[in-house]
Amino acid sequence: MLTLGIDTSNYATSLAVFDTDAGEVVCDCKKFLPVKEGQLGLRQSDALFHHTAALPAMLVELGARADLTQVRAVGVSARPRPVEGSYMPCFLAGVSAATAFSLSRALPLIELTHQQGHIAAALYAAGDFTLFERESLVFHVSGGTTDLLLCHGAERITPLGTSSDLYAGQAVDRLGVKLGFPFPAGVYVSEQAALCKEKVHPKVSVHGLTCSLSGLENQCAKLLADGHDAPYVCKYCLLCVGETLVRMANNALAEHPGLPVVFAGGVMSSDLIRTYVTNRVPNAHFVPGKFASDNAIGISILAARECVAWPTTSM
């Protein structure tokens, strides 16, 4: 059986189809929302418009790659996180499309959250499907979150720690835009950082399971003002994020020893961060970029699990 996943975040419009019999992603597609040069994202009304405009053509594209008449359930990100009061208008576009698709074919509609989708995609891509059936520590690190979560699969989520101010993705994007790169700027910051061969010594602020990243933006601005080049400052920024995650992860492992640590969210696409963290955190799981950044893959997988059509316990 096939399941369809839809996610309309503040960064991208994403669709995916999952085959429950094969346990594989049949296809997925994503379109980043257009952001004007020099701007740090979109207003919610603009994001909602761009999602609404993009979805019909993207469904046509998906239909050319998978037989959508075989879809038996539809999953959608209806809000950012599975906590009370979590809401962003941009997700209404996905809910509208998913509702129309499901009603037209009398299919079950499973409303999920953007964060659950990130977690499920990362658990799947980690290659150990038992992660869906046991506890793990999961970092969701993006432009809207720097969350440390205790998860049982992607369904039961307990927040453990977060940033008290700026999110990691915001720090990366603000640096990238300051350097003249388009938003979202993570890929460009990573490319610049890879050019730096100098040693960098990150300075971070972590207290227990809570971090502060507001100082990172100021540190990067000062480094640029002091004459450091873009590659050095980009490397400094990413390694500060990496060191922050290392300290939070090891503090969490002191309280929850032996658990796997899974890293999800767009910022976790950075090769530099992955290398830095995996050398310092035991049992760390990073995944390929398309499973880390915004996607609908995790939503399509969770739709299958909600319908008991992909029981990982039997694998």
Predicted regions and their residues:
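Short glycine-aspartate micro-motif
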Residues: 3-6, 73-75, 136-140, 262
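N-terminal phosphate-binding loop and adjacent alpha-helix
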Residues: 33-66
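Glycine-rich beta-strand-to-loop/alpha-helix junction loops that act as flexible
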Residues: 76-79, 142-144, 262-270
